[in-house]
């Protein structure tokens, strides 16, 4: 990819196939970009960037530039071949076909198209971006000239030929339509994380991200690092300077010569590896390619991330199945052959072997089959056997060639197996339970009367006193209450046997009914709303983070499917004389309600006019219902998982052993400690 290929004739007007127009896109944007909220808005950037990355994957581009402007527009530029400008068979310039016809793109022409591999089926990309924008400008360098075109609500102008040039490439700038999207404000952190991921997956590709919206004197959190190396140990003076220094986000350059090796370094940068080298290999087949990088660390959680044609396959798929099968088989055979396991000993399980494993599996498939509309699970059956064969051959070679590291890996897996066996009694308490079977539920659970999971809610509440108020104030038809006594165990620092001996963890897993890890079965979930309700202070936030860490590490699909929420209890109660009280959820809202009320002639109680809630236990049942539990007025924040790798790193920093990394993160993000969106 690093060496640019000059073969524009391979990607010309004849490579473009038209399937249908854009009429339906503006009517049903959610079908094409997922939503009209923030996620859908950012999807516009992904579609344009993916097209530039396709040029890089095909070997024609080495650099992509992404720029966020003050006027809400986004510009994506690459130095690829440039979108064709020749007249298409339909009689219009090919660039107009690409920009105005749904599914029109070189990637739909099979072996005769401009691409052998592309990012899934996002050939709908630029045309959908055009359909959902008020204006799009396209500048092309191709065929010896500069070309420019614009689109007003997807209607093309006249293609203009400019000055002569020997350069090639495409620049697309678009303005998302505010009448379609709920917001047109892009989040730098979201964009940076996705672009960093793309750079990791495309070894040697340079991606520049510039945020023109940041003023020179504005202090912004450094939300992403563009280095894959582990942090260098700092002196006390350096730590002090680093903690107090403002982090300005204006320009980030992502360039990883090591590709997936750098990705694994990045994942493990706050952890302690148990082997010196990173395992790195690749393989090619008929219409398939696979690349793998992996390294074990001293932690207890696995961090395996899979991609197909640079698309993050959150739900895994056949490529992950092939990798897992090969790894489990190779490690068990090696352990038996080297007498690290006795012949009579049971085999190590996949969970045992993957404990502490950081791995990235990236496949390129000429004709990918993604299950569902979201493209998060690869379905190509032939990919499993291909990946399994490559991984089997390469892992056998690595284990034989690295006996010291191999022994450390096997011993860690054996230690994990011993912990698993020791936890067997505890695990029996958290076996999967039927969605309607109430047997064996924890005694402190106040269950709801409904047996329909779709309408049932579970409030996990901090403290018995708050749990009592919640039980009294709830609607017992559909709301269940599970009170917790104090802080649960930090699963980031404990092995599964210790985790499953914790009574609070037992109660949570048993109440949910799904089981954990490989036993997890989402169809057995007893509640489709799991609401974490803790005090609105630092201790409450810590408890919420502990609970989220448990769910992320042991029952991640609950988050992926959108079943987990954070309750938003009020911070203040304003008591007016001879009038109903009002509740404020922040300092600014308190000040606003007070100012408005006084202007309207209201009088605040003199002695206890403004009450600050120190905890949920200070609210009676009626207040808790009216402010935090009544579906008609409550505010719930849904916990989402857009980037598993970023979330994995975040939980490792917040709940892991690296104190310096945690201090640095908290210092940079101190201004927004109210809520951390995972």
From Swiss-Prot:
<feature type="binding site">
    <location>
        <position position="462"/>
    </location>
    <ligand>
        <name>Mg(2+) 1</name>
    </ligand>
</feature>
<feature type="site" description="Interaction with DNA">
    <location>
        <position position="487"/>
    </location>
</feature>
<dbReference type="InterPro" id="IPR001241">
    <property type="entry name" value="Topo_IIA"/>
</dbReference>
<dbReference type="GO" id="GO:0046872">
    <property type="term" value="F:metal ion binding"/>
</dbReference>
<keyword id="KW-0067">ATP-binding</keyword>
<dbReference type="GO" id="GO:0003677">
    <property type="term" value="F:DNA binding"/>
</dbReference>
<feature type="binding site">
    <location>
        <position position="535"/>
    </location>
    <ligand>
        <name>Mg(2+) 1</name>
    </ligand>
</feature>
<dbReference type="InterPro" id="IPR002288">
    <property type="entry name" value="DNA_gyrase_B_C"/>
</dbReference>
<dbReference type="InterPro" id="IPR014721">
    <property type="entry name" value="Ribsml_uS5_D2-typ_fold_subgr"/>
</dbReference>
<dbReference type="Pfam" id="PF01751">
    <property type="entry name" value="Toprim"/>
</dbReference>
<protein>
    <recommendedName>
        <fullName>DNA gyrase subunit B</fullName>
        <ecNumber>5.6.2.2</ecNumber>
    </recommendedName>
</protein>
<dbReference type="InterPro" id="IPR013506">
    <property type="entry name" value="Topo_IIA_bsu_dom2"/>
</dbReference>
<dbReference type="Pfam" id="PF00204">
    <property type="entry name" value="DNA_gyraseB"/>
</dbReference>
<comment type="similarity">
    <text>Belongs to the type II topoisomerase GyrB family.</text>
</comment>
<dbReference type="GO" id="GO:0005737">
    <property type="term" value="C:cytoplasm"/>
</dbReference>
<dbReference type="Pfam" id="PF02518">
    <property type="entry name" value="HATPase_c"/>
</dbReference>
<dbReference type="InterPro" id="IPR020568">
    <property type="entry name" value="Ribosomal_Su5_D2-typ_SF"/>
</dbReference>
<dbReference type="GO" id="GO:0005524">
    <property type="term" value="F:ATP binding"/>
</dbReference>
<feature type="binding site">
    <location>
        <position position="537"/>
    </location>
    <ligand>
        <name>Mg(2+) 2</name>
    </ligand>
</feature>
<feature type="domain" description="Toprim">
    <location>
        <begin position="456"/>
        <end position="570"/>
    </location>
</feature>
<keyword id="KW-0963">Cytoplasm</keyword>
<feature type="binding site">
    <location>
        <position position="535"/>
    </location>
    <ligand>
        <name>Mg(2+) 2</name>
    </ligand>
</feature>
<dbReference type="InterPro" id="IPR011557">
    <property type="entry name" value="GyrB"/>
</dbReference>
<keyword id="KW-0479">Metal-binding</keyword>
<dbReference type="InterPro" id="IPR013759">
    <property type="entry name" value="Topo_IIA_B_C"/>
</dbReference>
<keyword id="KW-0547">Nucleotide-binding</keyword>
<dbReference type="GO" id="GO:0006265">
    <property type="term" value="P:DNA topological change"/>
</dbReference>
<dbReference type="GO" id="GO:0006261">
    <property type="term" value="P:DNA-templated DNA replication"/>
</dbReference>
<dbReference type="InterPro" id="IPR036890">
    <property type="entry name" value="HATPase_C_sf"/>
</dbReference>
<comment type="subunit">
    <text>Heterotetramer, composed of two GyrA and two GyrB chains. In the heterotetramer, GyrA contains the active site tyrosine that forms a transient covalent intermediate with the DNA, while GyrB binds cofactors catalyzes ATP hydrolysis.</text>
</comment>
<comment type="function">
    <text>A type II topoisomerase that negatively supercoils closed circular double-stranded (ds) DNA in an ATP-dependent manner to modulate DNA topology and maintain chromosomes in an underwound state. Negative supercoiling favors strand separation, and DNA replication, transcription, recombination and repair, all of which involve strand separation. Also able to catalyze the interconversion of other topological isomers of dsDNA rings, including catenanes and knotted rings. Type II topoisomerases break and join 2 DNA strands simultaneously in an ATP-dependent manner.</text>
</comment>
<dbReference type="GO" id="GO:0034335">
    <property type="term" value="F:DNA negative supercoiling activity"/>
</dbReference>
<keyword id="KW-0799">Topoisomerase</keyword>
<feature type="site" description="Interaction with DNA">
    <location>
        <position position="490"/>
    </location>
</feature>
<dbReference type="InterPro" id="IPR013760">
    <property type="entry name" value="Topo_IIA-like_dom_sf"/>
</dbReference>
<keyword id="KW-0238">DNA-binding</keyword>
<dbReference type="GO" id="GO:0005694">
    <property type="term" value="C:chromosome"/>
</dbReference>
<dbReference type="InterPro" id="IPR006171">
    <property type="entry name" value="TOPRIM_dom"/>
</dbReference>
<dbReference type="Pfam" id="PF00986">
    <property type="entry name" value="DNA_gyraseB_C"/>
</dbReference>
<dbReference type="InterPro" id="IPR000565">
    <property type="entry name" value="Topo_IIA_B"/>
</dbReference>
<keyword id="KW-0460">Magnesium</keyword>
<dbReference type="InterPro" id="IPR018522">
    <property type="entry name" value="TopoIIA_CS"/>
</dbReference>
């Amino acid at each position: 990819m690093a060496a640019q290929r000059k073969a524009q004739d391979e990607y010309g007007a004849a490579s473009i196939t038209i399937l249908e127009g854009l009429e339906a896109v503006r009517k049903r944007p959610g079908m094409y970009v997922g939503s009209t909220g923030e996620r859908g808005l950012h999807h516009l950037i992904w579609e344009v960037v993916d097209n530039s990355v396709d040029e890089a994957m095909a070997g024609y581009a080495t650099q992509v530039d992404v720029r966020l402007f003050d006027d809400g527009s986004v510009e994506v530029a690459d130095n690829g071949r440039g979108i064709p400008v020749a007249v298409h068979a339909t009689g219009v310039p090919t660039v107009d076909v690409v920009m105005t016809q749904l599914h029109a793109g070189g990637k739909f022409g099979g072996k005769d198209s401009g691409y052998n591999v592309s990012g899934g089926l996002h050939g709908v990309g630029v045309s959908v971006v055009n359909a959902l924008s008020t204006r799009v400008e396209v500048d092309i360098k191709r065929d010896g000239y500069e070309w420019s075109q614009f689109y007003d609500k997807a209607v093309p102008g006249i293609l203009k030929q400019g000055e002569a040039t020997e350069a090639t490439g495409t620049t697309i700038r678009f303005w998302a339509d505010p009448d379609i999207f709920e917001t047109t404000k892009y989040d730098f952190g979201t964009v940076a994380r996705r672009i960093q991921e793309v750079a990791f997956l495309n070894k040697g590709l340079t991606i520049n991200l510039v945020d023109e919206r940041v003023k020179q004197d504005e202090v912004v959190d450094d939300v992403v690092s563009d280095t894959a190396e582990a942090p260098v140990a700092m002196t006390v003076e350096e730590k002090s300077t680093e903690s107090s220094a403002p982090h300005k986000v204006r320009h980030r350059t992502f360039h990883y010569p090591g590709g997936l090796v750098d990705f694994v370094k990045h994942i493990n940068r706050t952890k302690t590896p148990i082997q010196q080298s990173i395992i790195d290999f690749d393989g090619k087949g008929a219409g398939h390619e696979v690349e793998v990088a992996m390294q074990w660390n001293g932690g207890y959680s696995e961090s395996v991330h899979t991609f197909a044609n640079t698309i993050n396959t959150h739900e895994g798929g056949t490529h992950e199945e092939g990798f897992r099968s090969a790894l489990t088989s190779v490690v068990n055979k090696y352990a038996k052959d080297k007498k690290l396991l006795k012949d009579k000993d049971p085999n190590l399980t996949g969970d045992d072997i993957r404990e502490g494993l950081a791995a990235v599996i990236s496949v390129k498939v000429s004709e990918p089959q993604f299950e569902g509309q979201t493209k998060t699970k690869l379905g190509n059956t032939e990919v499993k056997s291909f990946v399994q064969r490559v991984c089997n051959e390469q892992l056998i070679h690595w284990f034989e060639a690295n006996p010291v590291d191999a022994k450390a890996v096997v011993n860690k897996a054996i230690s994990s197996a011993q912990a698993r066996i020791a936890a067997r009694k505890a695990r029996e308490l958290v076996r999967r339970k039927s969605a309607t079977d109430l047997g064996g539920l924890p005694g402190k659970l106040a269950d709801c009367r409904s047996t329909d999971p779709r309408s049932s809610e579970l409030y996990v509440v901090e403290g018995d006193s708050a749990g009592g108020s919640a039980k009294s104030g709830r609607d017992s038809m559909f709301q269940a209450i599970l009170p917790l006594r104090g802080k649960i165990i930090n699963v980031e620092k404990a092995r599964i046997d210790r985790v499953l001996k914790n009574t609070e963890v037992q109660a949570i897993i048993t109440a949910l009914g799904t089981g954990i890890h490989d036993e997890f079965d989402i169809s057995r979930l007893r509640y489709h709303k799991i609401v974490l309700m803790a005090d609105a202070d630092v201790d409450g936030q810590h408890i919420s983070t502990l609970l989220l860490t448990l769910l992320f590490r042991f029952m991640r699909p609950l988050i992926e499917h959108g079943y987990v929420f954070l309750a938003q209890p009020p911070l203040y109660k304003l008591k007016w004389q001879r009038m109903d009280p009002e509740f404020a959820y922040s300092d600014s809202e308190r000040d606003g309600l007070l100012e408005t009320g006084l202007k309207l002639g209201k009088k605040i109680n003199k002695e206890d006019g403004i009450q600050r809630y120190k905890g949920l236990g200070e609210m009676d049942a009626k207040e808790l219902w009216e402010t935090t539990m009544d579906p008609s007025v409550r505010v719930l924040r849904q916990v989402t998982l857009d980037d598993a790798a970023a979330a994995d790193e975040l939980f490792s920093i917040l709940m892991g052993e690296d104190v310096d990394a945690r201090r640095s993160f908290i210092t940079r993000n101190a201004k927004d400690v109210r809520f951390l969106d995972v």
